[in-house]
């Protein structure tokens, strides 16, 4: 096995990358739920870097097995894999397709590279006889879109349509409906913004009424949208200006999940590869249809933490059903129940992420995934320059510092169900922090 770097022409980037990887490796196997255990927990961790690594790094990270993409460790992991996980990497909002208002998102190069790798690994798995491997595509939404997502019921009410119909309605039509509803039904955003900015609401009354609580959360999110903009004062702006700002925010809102786009891209990639190998149409359709059946889309998450907390229950449920448990009964189980039933079952997860994202993905997967999982991490072939990679990795390291502190010291647990609950409350609950606060914490986080 040889993963040693061949070239040293980009030493600064390599030095930074290996320093960051060393920091991450030192934090593996942490367990705040059992701080007094004499023996630290352990598991098999295999790391397949796209860029080679030095012998020095391998010596500094004895907890990690470094492997080549064609190495025996990878061959065995793919052949045994219960699941292949495609970690999403943001999105780019573009002008929506004509007649398809919900399709306004473009996958970034990192997600495209990850998706190509996942398709290749799936074909490798079925060629080895592993024909029941599950594929999970995670979803991502930038934390800047949380407020718009939360305020969506208000936009729906302003337009006089159901919330689920908003993303399927064109921007032009939404504006027409909102303006019409304002005239005909006197719907005024100023009232909601004012209510969200005062302390006149009876918290006891709101807490006793889930519908009022939901509306309060929506109204506060609406106010955050306005407070985040430099061109508007929510307390003095006219109704028309508030409406324009809300519609402008919605125009930039991603309306289709990256998990859906990655699944579609993967199915297309696999079909094209099989066609290039000379497979006939019937063979291609059979393989692609089975891949479609065995693929799950994780709902949009705010960050990589919630990517895992949302995906883990799906992966455990899939394993239990494969083991013969009734699907309806599994659907009623808590995450803790699923973990307990599978505690003695060795499972293998192959996780694909890009170079900059991978160190944090590795730490989070080890921290959040149950200990019965063996983990193999494979970096995708992202064609970014080293300068772009380093800038991205520096942002990731800041997020790693913030996130590890959040999980270890503030949450104090690695139970994925509990972490998911706490994270959802932090992002979506009535006491959630604002987008501005989230971004400020990320930007101000000092790397130790």
PLM regions and their residue ranges:
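Glycine-rich flexible loop motifs, especially short His-Gly-Gly/GGXG/HXGH segments used as catalytic or interaction
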Residues: 388-448
């Amino acid at each position: 096995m040889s993963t040693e770097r061949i070239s040293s022409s980009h030493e600064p980037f390599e030095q930074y990358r290996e320093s960051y990887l060393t920091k991450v490796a030192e934090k593996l196997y942490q367990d705040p739920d059992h701080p007094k255990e004499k023996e630290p927990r352990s598991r098999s961790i295999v790391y397949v870097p796209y860029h080679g690594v030095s012998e020095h790094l391998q010596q500094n990270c004895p907890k990690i097995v470094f492997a080549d993409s064609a190495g025996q460790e990878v061959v065995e992991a793919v052949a045994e894999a219960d699941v292949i996980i495609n970690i999403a990497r943001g999105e780019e909002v573009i002008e929506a397709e004509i007649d398809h208002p919900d399709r306004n998102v473009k996958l970034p190069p990192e997600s495209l590279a990850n998706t190509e790798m996942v398709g290749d690994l799936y074909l490798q798995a079925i060629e080895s006889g592993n024909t029941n491997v599950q594929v999970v595509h995670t979803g991502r939404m930038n934390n800047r879109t949380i407020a718009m997502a939360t305020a969506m019921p208000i936009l729906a009410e302003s337009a006089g349509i159901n919330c689920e119909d908003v993303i399927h309605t064109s921007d032009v039509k939404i504006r027409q409906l909102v303006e019409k509803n304002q005239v005909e039904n006197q719907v005024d955003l100023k009232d909601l913004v004012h209510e969200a900015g005062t302390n006149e609401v009876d918290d006891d009354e709101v807490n006793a009424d889930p519908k009022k609580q939901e509306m309060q959360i929506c109204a506060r999110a609406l106010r955050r949208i306005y407070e985040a903009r430099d061109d508007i004062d929510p307390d003095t702006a006219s109704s028309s200006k508030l409406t324009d700002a809300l519609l402008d925010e919605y125009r930039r809102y991603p309306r289709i999940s990256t998990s859906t786009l990655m699944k579609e891209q993967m199915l297309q990639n696999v079909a094209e590869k099989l066609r290039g190998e000379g497979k006939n149409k019937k063979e291609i359709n059979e393989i692609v249809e089975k891949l479609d059946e065995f693929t799950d889309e994780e709902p949009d998450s705010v960050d990589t933490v919630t990517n895992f907390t949302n995906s883990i229950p799906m992966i455990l449920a899939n394993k239990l059903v494969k083991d013969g448990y009734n699907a309806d009964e599994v659907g009623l189980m808590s995450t803790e129940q699923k973990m307990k039933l599978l505690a003695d079952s060795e499972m293998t997860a192959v996780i694909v992420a890009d170079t900059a994202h991978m160190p944090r993905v590795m730490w989070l997967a080890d921290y959040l995934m149950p200990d019965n999982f063996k983990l193999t991490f494979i970096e995708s072939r992202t064609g970014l320059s080293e300068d772009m990679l380093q800038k991205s990795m520096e942002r990731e390291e800041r997020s790693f510092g913030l996130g590890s502190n959040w999980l270890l010291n503030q949450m104090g647990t690695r139970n994925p169900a509990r972490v998911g609950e706490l994270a959802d409350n932090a992002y979506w609950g009535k006491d959630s922090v604002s987008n501005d606060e989230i971004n400020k914490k990320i930007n101000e986080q000092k790397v130790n």
